[in-house]
């Protein structure tokens, strides 16, 4: 399906770890090369731990630092872009709705016409409770592009949902895999240290593959104005 290539862009990414850490540097570069206003907001409440260094996009100097802040400051500074990040988990609907609210821009100084941002929500938190929250936000949005990625050690999926004029044009992850909406998952902040330690680690290959699928969709939406809506 077609997407506009002349509107300002806002990308909001939930999760700056396994997948988000590899998505971030290339989204920053992609937005930097656009000839229109673009913003990138990275959100994550987690900190960099030693166990993250082998499979996530961090280095020893990042240990103990907030993941969203590390990624946002590192790449926005290098590219001369505004640094925007939220150093906490997004777990409440009003907070998410505020993040994905499109800003209006005056692109022509000689005209009073204002243009709304095209908003992309990237779900890089492999957690079904967060997907349920994003599903709610998606269906309450007048317009939104919601790309969700999820992967295990060897398999995964990336699904792009589209809302336009208050209608669902393409189903999001919750519509494609409705079983995820029934899962009794916990938000990241609700998971204890013991439970987190027992989680099966994802492989770096799966993380990079999922990130690449997300980036292909984002690139095609913003530059080619067309994309396939699922990747497995």
Protein language model features and the residues they cover:
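A short, basic/flexible loop-to-alpha-helix module at the beginning of a structural domain
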Residues: 1-9
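Mid-domain beta-loop-alpha active-site segment that forms a flexible
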Residues: 202-222
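Glycine-rich adenosine-cofactor-binding loop
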Residues: 10-29, 44
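E1/E1-like adenylate-forming module used to activate ubiquitin-like modifiers
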Residues: 113-209
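Glycine-rich phosphate-binding loop and adjoining beta1-alpha1-beta2 segment
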Residues: 39-80
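A structured beta-alpha segment of the ubiquitous adenosine-cofactor-binding alpha/beta core
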Residues: 68-117, 125-128
């Amino acid at each position: 399906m077609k997407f506009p290539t002349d509107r300002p862009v806002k990308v909001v990414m939930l999760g700056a770890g396994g997948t988000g850490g590899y998505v971030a540097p290339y989204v920053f570069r992609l937005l930097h090369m656009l000839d229109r206003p673009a913003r990138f907001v990275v959100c994550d409440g987690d900190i960099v731990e030693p166990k993250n260094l082998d499979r996530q996009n961090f280095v020893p100097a990042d240990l103990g630092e907030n993941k969203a802040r590390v990624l946002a400051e590192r790449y926005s500074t290098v590219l001369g872009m505004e640094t925007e990040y939220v150093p906490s988990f997004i777990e409440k609907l009003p907070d998410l709705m505020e993040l994905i609210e499109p800003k209006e821009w005056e692109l022509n100084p000689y005209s009073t016409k204002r243009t709304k941002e095209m908003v992309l929500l990237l779900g890089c938190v492999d957690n079904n409770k967060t997907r349920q929250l994003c599903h709610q936000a998606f269906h309450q949005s007048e317009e939104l592009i919601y790309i969700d990625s999820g992967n295990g050690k060897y398999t995964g999926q990336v699904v792009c949902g589209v809302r336009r004029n208050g209608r669902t044009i393409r189903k999001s992850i919750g519509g494609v895999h409705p079983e995820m909406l029934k899962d009794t998952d916990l938000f990241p902040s609700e998971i204890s240290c013991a439970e987190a330690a027992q989680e099966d680690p994802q492989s770096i290959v799966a993380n990079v593959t999922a990130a690449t699928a997300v980036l292909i969709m984002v690139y095609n939406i913003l530059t080619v104005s067309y994309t396939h809506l699922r990747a497995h």
